[in-house]
Amino acid sequence: NVSKVVVEITADTPYILIVADKDSLWTSSDSLNFESPVKFKVLAQSMEYGAVYTAEINVHKQEPDSLVWSNLSSDFNGSAIQAQKAVYFNDKIYVFAVRQGEEQVAVTTTSITDGHSWSSLQPLPFGEKADYSTAMAWGDHLYIIAENQLYQSENGTDWSKIESAPALKMLVSNIYSQNNPEKNNKLIAINTNNMFVETHNGTEWTEQKSVPYGFPETSLSFVSYPLNTNSSIDRMLVLGENPIATDTTSVVWGQLSTENTWGDYPPEKDNLDFCPKLANIAMIHYNNQLYAFGGPGKKNGSNLAPFSAFYESVN
């Protein structure tokens, strides 16, 4: 609310006037209405007026959390790409992509503060063998799987194979916590034996439990964040395509950093506010809420146009 704002003004004279239809002397206890710019002028000791100064408070007028998007003119050639995944890493956005008519995975990047200028698509050194959908950032490295082998990079250009990693088919989620890093930080994957495996340093891996029925393995996205009630514990949530072809809901599973098992979040009976099954669905965590969006889908018997809406949840 900027209709009643108390301000502090420093000048060589106590005679500061508020310019309006009828000028008035400003005092430090005045609350001023800054819904419109306010003008001041100073009366010097010589009793002469100086220049008129204008003060304005910039107010964010967009409705908060409305997720209004604006189109950025850029040299990103999206029409040449048939599949892609974006990853945030080291203040940059990396897009791992497969060009139309090709199988090779390439990467392009832009600064998080830019979005207009993108680097040219650079094929990964093992691009024809890589799975773009497994690209993930964890700690100070990027990761991707190629022919069941795990690779890492510090810059998206130079990659090295992690020889000690088991044969993997997908990366699931990770925690990179600032609150309790020694206990919470972990990278979770699924190996070729359909078992969960995890690492706390990228080199030493531990096999956990088998992947349960119904766990999503297609169009997988994840978020991790500290609990509001206990910041030393992190929650991981995974969202993906429902493996049941006739089901119209997306699948959500979760795990706490203090656990080593996953639990699902099935839609409650007669609850119509479920997350619909969308093609290539993705999930983000923003401002203590979850947001999901994706391609074409269906909900409550109606067809959903691709990328026509965000679906939000607090739990």
Predicted regions and their residues:
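Loop/turn-rich, solvent-exposed surfaces of beta-rich toroidal or solenoidal domains
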Residues: 274-311
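Conserved core beta-strand positions within WD40 beta-propeller blades
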Residues: 92-94, 141-143, 185-186, 235-237, ...
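Repeated scaffold domains used in trafficking and secretory/extracellular systems
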Residues: 76-88, 123-140, 164-185, 210-232, ...
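Beta-strand-rich domains and repeat architectures in extracellular enzymes and scaffolds
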Residues: 72-104
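Beta-propeller fold detector
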Residues: 65-74, 116-126, 160-168, 206-214, ...
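Beta-rich interaction/scaffold domains
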Residues: 1-83, 115-127, 158-160
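Structural motif
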Residues: 99-111, 146-158, 183-204, 233-257, ...
